[in-house]
Amino acid sequence: MKIYIIRHGETNGNLRGVLQGWTDEPLNSKGRKLAQITGKCLASIGFDIAISSPLSRAYETCEIVLRENRNPVPTIEVDDRLKEINFGCWENLGITKKNYQIPNKNFNLFYTNPFLLENSYDGESVCDVCHRTEDIYLELISKPRYRDKNILLATHGFALRCLLRQVYEDKTDFWHGKIPDNCAVNIIDVVDGKGTLIGDDLIYYDKTLAVNPYTPI
């Protein structure tokens, strides 16, 4: 079994430098282009199963990637466990030096050790997201339906890192260097129920096109 996990393409929310979370922000034109380029580079892979977050930026990314595929493609399934972290009342607030609005002076912990950050009163905790992404991963590697299949998952930056904790050797390093770029692809090879990361934050477009405003301030 191989699991290909893709972060969604660029959105205007990414460009504005705001927390999107469960806000249903669509892809922008560049985000669609990045998904198309990525899809062309994955076109030879025969995906047996495709599962997406229900949020449109992830679902449309999945659609575009499959549209470029040269093999028969599966119908996209939707799974809430792949949704981004719910930031609650912090959603759509700015997090850059120019537009910072988060009412928590310790928000930089989000970038350094998010397990120490107290979430908004109406949002999810890091552990909440880790538990639901662990749940879908364990389901994928254990159920006969998924055995020996190529699986495409479309998700979000934070949820992706939570899911990859199942295969990271160093689980204390949450971000492993950075928030994944838009349309970054991570590949897990699963043999006898054990997953190994064989592709780490792969991007298939010109790296100068990557925009990442999500950095400590």
Each model region followed by its residue ranges:
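Extreme N-terminal starter segment of soluble prokaryotic enzymes
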Residues: 1-4
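Active-site metal-binding loops of divalent metal-dependent hydrolases
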Residues: 9, 157, 201
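Loop-to-helix element that buttresses phosphate recognition and phosphoryl-transfer chemistry
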Residues: 10-60, 122-134
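Phosphate-coordination/substrate-recognition cap region in phosphate-metabolizing enzymes
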Residues: 37-107
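Alpha-helix capping/helix-boundary segments
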Residues: 57, 159-160
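Acidic, low-complexity terminal tails and accessory targeting/binding regions
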Residues: 85-99, 142, 146-149, 165-217
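Short glycine/proline- and acidic residue-enriched helix-loop micro-motifs
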Residues: 106-128
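GST-like fold's C-terminal all-alpha helical module
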Residues: 129-157
